[in-house]
């Protein structure tokens, strides 16, 4: 399919504040054929005009694993998963602090603490509210927390403790949500994001691509998330885990994944777009191209799935001449 939009011109119009990408133009990107590389070049131009060759590094700690009452079909920690994973309660505070120190030493500027479960207990919130100030006092790290459907009081406590950001992904389009999880709804996720906003905490929210969503659904989801004004957008590509309902699910191709990221770059030109889980698997020889499009990425492992050695990640970024500093986006 050839396309009608001049995407370099569109990028300039976006940069000048004159316009933003339309639904139709976003769909055109996903449907592009032989001229996809022209769109990629325009998306890269857009990224470089905003944040140059800077990339921020995130390290993820699985601080509580398994034992989850939700039934998310992609997740090895859900109650319906038979995946062989370690299961444990919230790690002791000294262990979390030690892992934060290691993250800082490895060049991370963001330390992500992830907890399984519907939401933390009162005791777990108290523990988090003790360790967060300790990390902030001793290390120049931003802290992002993933902890399920946090209520207003829990968010207020975390805000007082100094949390920088809360992650709560929308994951998949609303019409696809019942195919992925039934113990909660898409609305439950949107409501959680609203509560985070209301406590004046930065929102980190994104997607898991490759779970049966349509192109139209993915674009609608992106525009819905844009309305919620996230600080950062982690983009995951399904890591099909044996023992989960989506364990044999895989219809993504490297070029499709690259088009998705180019589209999201146009939808979120001034936000922190993060390349997350699945990059090592789905992009194959295109991983260099997609890494140049984003503002941040993860070092090392994910939750229950392995990533790359962190030093290998750093070497890869340096070969691309990306500056992994701790500077904020322009």
UniProtKB/Swiss-Prot annotation:
Where does the source fall among the domains of life? Answer: Bacteria
Q: What reactions does this protein catalyze?
A: (4R,5S)-dethiobiotin + (sulfur carrier)-SH + 2 reduced [2Fe-2S]-[ferredoxin] + 2 S-adenosyl-L-methionine = (sulfur carrier)-H + biotin + 2 5'-deoxyadenosine + 2 L-methionine + 2 oxidized [2Fe-2S]-[ferredoxin]
Q: Which SUPFAM superfamilies match?
A: Radical SAM enzymes
Its name, as the record gives it, is Biotin synthase
The UniProt record lists the EC number as 2.8.1.6
Q: In which pathway does it act?
A: Cofactor biosynthesis; biotin biosynthesis; biotin from 7,8-diaminononanoate: step 2/2
Description of how the protein assembles with itself and partners: Homodimer.
Q: Per its UniProt record, what PROSITE patterns does this chain match?
A: RADICAL_SAM
The cofactor note from the UniProt entry for this protein is: Binds 1 [4Fe-4S] cluster. The cluster is coordinated with 3 cysteines and an exchangeable S-adenosyl-L-methionine. Binds 1 [2Fe-2S] cluster. The cluster is coordinated with 3 cysteines and 1 arginine.
HAMAP family, alphabetically?
A: BioB
The alphabetized UniProt keywords are: 2Fe-2S, 4Fe-4S, Biotin biosynthesis, Iron, Iron-sulfur, Metal-binding, S-adenosyl-L-methionine, Transferase
What is this organism's lineage? Bacteria, Bacillati, Bacillota, Bacilli, Lactobacillales
User: Which gene underlies this protein?
Assistant: bioB
* Native organism: Streptococcus agalactiae serotype V (strain ATCC BAA-611 / 2603 V/R)
